[in-house]
């Protein structure tokens, strides 16, 4: 056997050397050729299963990105490199010597403890202050409510006092009115006294006037006689005027009665005229009814005639059809009889 040869196969940027013998090379070439260019199946022969067909010949898919030279780095590598570049090296942090403890640190720690205690105290004070403020607020609210109640009571008391003052003022007004009435009554009494004094004076005057009145009464009697005569004349004139007015009224009444009679006659005539057209309307209605009855009878007669004509025509058509059918039947029967007779004659 010959020495194994090295076959160079290119897979992207890497070079892999695979040792392949000549026999294996020949067999591989034959199988590869048979797969690429299979022989046509001969008639009458069964196809043998080849080992290359039994095996799972999956072709490896080569990515184009892998074949290219510019392969991207994985994400984890990229991230780690970026972190290293940003962050200082761990060795520097490890080699750094720890600082010596100084007094300032102790002082700072004490100050911090004191500050914490002070903060705790301030927080406690704040809480107590807030609680006290809440309590004070509640108390103030209660006080405010009490103050409001007191104000309302004061307002009610003021209202009551105002009402009392108003009532007192009304009482005073009524008292003043009564006093005014008393004063008015006194004034009336004084006026009455003055009137009585005047009456006495008038009585004395009337006594003085009586002598003058007697003279006037004599003159008045004469005047009364003259007035009576004039009154009689006036009564006579009035009686004449009344007679004239009564005559005029009677004349007017007569004219009015005549006019009323004329109007009544005209109204009666109008009613008669109205009754006449109503009678004519009734006559016209009767005529219309008679005409409608006549038309109805005429229409009924026409319809009956049409029906009878149709029935007669149908009966005639049926009779003709039946006659034709009977004639045909008779002709057929006669033809059959003649045929039978002819057949009998021929048989003899």
From Swiss-Prot:
Protein's name in the database: Cylicin-2
InterPro entries: CYLC (IPR026189), Cylicin_N (IPR029354)
Region span, 3 X approximate tandem repeats: 157-240
Primary site of residence: cytoplasm
Molecular function terms from GO: structural constituent of cytoskeleton
Region (Disordered) location: 35-59, 101-348
UniProt-annotated location(s): Cytoplasm, Cytoskeleton, Perinuclear theca, Calyx; Cytoplasm, Cytoskeleton, Perinuclear theca
GO biological process, one term: spermatogenesis
Chain's role: Plays a role in the establishment of normal sperm morphology during spermatogenesis. It is required for acrosome attachment to the nuclear envelope, and proper manchette elongation and disassembly.
Spans of repeat Sequence: 157-184, 185-212, 213-240
Tissue-level expression: Testis.
GO terms for cellular component: cytoskeletal calyx; nucleus
Pfam families: Cylicin_N
Keywords for this protein: Cytoplasm, Cytoskeleton, Developmental protein, Differentiation, Repeat, Spermatogenesis
UniProt superkingdom: Eukaryota
Region 31 X 3 AA repeats of K-K-X, annotated ranges: 25-347
Keyword Transferase: no
Compositional bias (Basic and acidic residues): 103-159, 166-217, 238-267, 276-342
